[in-house]
Amino acid sequence: VVHGGPGALGTVAAIARVLSKDSGVIEPLQTSDSIPELLNELDEVITACCDRPITLIGHSWGAWLVFMYAAKYPQWVKKIILVGSGPFEAKYVSEIACNRIKHLSDAEGAEFDELLKRLNSDKEIEKGRLLERLGALVNKSDNYCAFEIDTEKEDCLPVEGDKYSAIWKEAAALRESGELLGFADRIICPVVAIHGEYDPHPVDGVKLSLRNKFKDFIMYTLGKCGHSPWKEKHAYQEF
């Protein structure tokens, strides 16, 4: 189970904990600061812990990471499950901000834009603190009716703003160039996508971009659900 962010270590622990009741689960923490290094790091964990192809679940940014991993190391992947993935094509990006603004006050929306600008600046030195504040706003804009998980505070490690900035620049460039979606041509396993209808990341940016790329693709859209289905009051059981 691969966390999002980038830099949001421990945020999918609740998923891993529930799944571990029925099967073995790995929750790798991303410690590198470039996409090639993250892919190598993930491969090292998988090859050290597994002796057969596995199912990879990625949330948010983590969905992209498992998508790229499945393309680069197809021999290790039985299936990928993309939860709350960002859109795979640049043409959908503008919808994210528009959808988030609808869920925030005017002041919060302005603050959100300013935080993103500062996080993407090479001159900013307090990126960890800024990312924490951004996370608080995202918690409001991206969730429908989320409940607090008892272990969340101890599960989650401090956010890493520098890693977010470095990795996200690479990831956004891959999407802008079309290379991100191009990874689909090398993925041979079944692909499942799970998306909340209230998630600001447009469902069409996943569904329409991927449905003709794979022979075995299934899309589930959850009602009354935001970006993190496992902690949504009305959707977690279906998830």
Language model regions located:
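Conserved alpha/beta-hydrolase "acid-adjacent" motif
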Residues: P200-V206
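Flexible "cap/lid" loop of the alpha/beta hydrolase fold
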Residues: I80-S121
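Catalytic histidine-centered segment of alpha/beta-hydrolase-like enzymes
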Residues: L222-Q237
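Alpha/beta-hydrolase
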Residues: D113-G182, C189
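Active-site loop/oxyanion-hole signature of alpha/beta-hydrolase fold enzymes
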Residues: I26-W61, K72
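Conserved hydrolase catalytic core segment
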Residues: R52-A97
